[in-house]
A protein has these predicted regions:
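A conserved hydrophobic secondary-structure block that centers on an alpha-helix together
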Residues: 146-210, 414
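Short loop/turn segments that connect beta-strands within beta-propeller blades
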Residues: 126, 193-197, 237-241, 285-289, ...
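A flexible loop/linker signature enriched in serine peptidases of the S9 family
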Residues: 111-118, 155-160, 179-188, 203-205, ...
């Protein structure tokens, strides 16, 4: 808070607290010297007393500040109300999300006019191969719809309410959820039956996060220290007192925070620990929840990495699966790289850099770029970069940074950044397995939304847009075949086809580019045959699409509604 005691009046004399208070009516925090010693240095903190939120002095001071704020803002009351009403008039309050399949249910969110919070809902899938989201109308319940969590009802009686995480068991019977009713970001987690609505007696109070094991027999959760740092992971057997819980990991280094979750394939419990520049991943098989967590790769100073797991189904010499570890790291490149490890031929302890390099970022213009390529640090960041390990679409990219990869049962999605814009590239899982086993660069194709091909007109309906796309898919097929490296996605425009020098035609230096954001999202199921992605720009509302990497069919699932227009 600004302290006016150091200000001088027109005469040059130092003004007192009282004179400043009298002139503007602003409350001024009193000074209560408290000595604190850090590393041998003494520091006098005159406002340490403000840390005690339960103190009557602190509460009185905050109340006085709030009154002062209302007093000073009173002349703007009408304008504030006008701005609020104008912004609210553009928001469609009665709305819902596109259903997302997880295990045996389609999950979605409803929002209702006049309600402060969303309502979490679900409906059962129709069959194991049901991958088309059900058609659900705004405000109209669908057969079999179940309310999973009505935040409006849960928030009643609380001045503040926030959900701090929600994990539903694989069989859909149990929900582990956390709530914060004070605003201090410490959450109380409970276990609720989704069949009866009743809750188990155990409550995990004041924690940072939690997850089930796949069988919902165990809960792992993160404890917070006095500085709100997540520092320890606890193990709890469902149905037993929390006093019997066991600490399974304790982070001694105060620079590091800790998190717990399940790997994408749900075969491992994952502890992620990291500081601002260093990360480490520890794993424990979900088949042995009482076992010991072990580091996948021991932490190295100033090295960030993450690991996920997948497999190439039936791609082995005798039709067996090939288990994979997919490592994303910056140990050898400041703009990150992705390595895929065949876990049949590599054994722990693993090291960063082993396996097949699938995508490598540019070292140009980076602080440690010289360690990758001599002279790279002094080169402009937009210098075209090529690497023999990279897919053809990345060769010659400007300012290339690798942002991640996800390997599902039917497709592989690569996310990267070039020319300061985010990009997505996709390929089928079968094609990725062939390239991996052959030791050649993977043949990704960039996904370019149709919005980049047209005049950004958004007056058409979803059905009209999809009908127009259907008319051009056949032509794009022929174009893809004519381009040589042509397992192109139907949703990809002519601009995205790889040119002879490896650059994309819409990314040439000196051209005017539309600014947009695109990203993979809403794909929690490993088995889903289609990939969802989002797209938005400064002049176009957010859109959610899905695309079939095998056929290239691109569907617009939802576009955000902006009431009253936005031109």
């Amino acid at each position: 808070m600004t302290d006016f005691r150091g200000e001088q009046g027109a005469t040059g004399a130092r003004e007192s607290d009282e004179s400043v208070q009298d002139k503007c009516g602003m409350p001024i925090a009193k000074r209560v010297p408290k000595e604190r010693v850090f590393h041998g240095d003494t520091f006098i903190d005159e406002y340490e007393w403000l840390r005690d939120k339960e103190s009557h002095d602190v509460q009185d001071y905050v109340a006085a500040q709030n009154r002062y704020c209302e007093q000073r803002m009173e002349p703007l009351k009408t304008l504030r109300s006008t701005l609020f009403d104008e912004l609210k008039s553009h928001v469609q309050e009665n709305d819902m999300s596109v259903p997302t399949r997880m295990d045996g249910y389609w999950y979605f969110v409803r929002t209702q006019e006049g309600q402060q919070y969303a309502v979490q809902c679900r409906v059962p899938i129709r069959s194991a191969d049901d991958w088309d989201p059900p058609t659900i109308e705004i405000g109209v319940p669908i057969d079999g719809e179940q309310v999973v969590f009505d935040t409006n009802a849960e928030a009643q009686g609380h001045d503040f309410f926030r959900i701090g995480g929600m994990h539903i068991s694989k069989d859909g019977r149990w929900m582990l959820y956390g709530t914060d009713t004070s605003g201090d970001e410490r959450y109380d987690f409970r276990i609720r039956s989704l069949e009866t609505g009743k809750e188990l007696p155990e409550v995990f109070k004041g924690i940072g996060g939690a997850c089930f094991t796949p069988d919902a027999q165990w809960v792992f959760y993160v404890k917070l220290d006095d500085a709100w740092r997540p520092y320890a992971v606890m193990r709890h057997r469902v149905g037993t007192p929390v006093t019997d819980d066991v600490e399974v990991y304790h982070e001694q280094d105060e620079r590091f925070w800790v998190g717990i979750g399940l790997s994408f394939d749900e075969r491992n419990l994952v502890i992620g620990t990291g500081s601002k520049t260093t990360t480490e991943v520890l794993l424990l098989s979900t088949d042995d929840p009482e076992g010991e967590f072990r580091a996948f790769i021991p932490r190295e100073p100033d090295v960030e990495y993450d690991v996920s797991f997948s497999c190439f189904e039936g791609a082995g010499e005798h039709g067996e699966d090939i288990p994979l570890a997919v490592v994303y790291h910056n140990a050898l490149n400041p703009n990150f790289e992705i390595d895929v490890i065949d876990m049949r031929s590599h054994e722990p302890p693993y090291r960063l850099g082993e396996g097949v390099r699938v995508a490598v970022g540019s070292p140009y213009g980076c602080e440690y770029g010289d360690e990758v390529e001599p002279g790279a640090s002094g080169m402009p960041i937009g210098t075209p970069y090529s690497n023999p390990c990279n897919p053809a679409i990345l060769q010659g990219a400007h300012g290339l940074g690798i942002e991640g990869i996800s390997i599902h049962r039917h497709y592989v999605a690569l996310q990267y950044r070039a020319e300061s814009l985010t990009h997505i590239a996709v390929m089928t899982k079968d094609a990725a397995a062939e390239d991996f086993l052959a030791g050649r660069p993977w043949k990704f194709t960039e996904l370019v939304p149709h919005a980049l091909e047209d005049d950004w007109d958004v007056d058409e309906s979803v059905d009209e847009i999809n009908e127009e796309r259907a008319e051009v898919w056949g032509a794009l097929d022929q174009l893809a075949a004519a381009q040589g490296e042509g397992s192109a996605v139907h949703g990809v425009s002519r601009k995205a086809m790889t040119s002879s020098d490896g650059a994309t035609a819409d990314a040439m230096p000196g051209e005017t580019r539309r600014l947009y954001s695109i990203g993979v999202g809403g794909n929690p199921s490993y088995d889903a045959p289609r990939m969802r992605y989002s797209f938005s720009s400064y002049t176009r509302p957010g859109e959610l699409h899905d695309i079939d990497p095998a056929t290239g069919e691109d569907r617009l699932l939802k576009r955000a509604t902006v009431l009253g227009g936005f031109e």
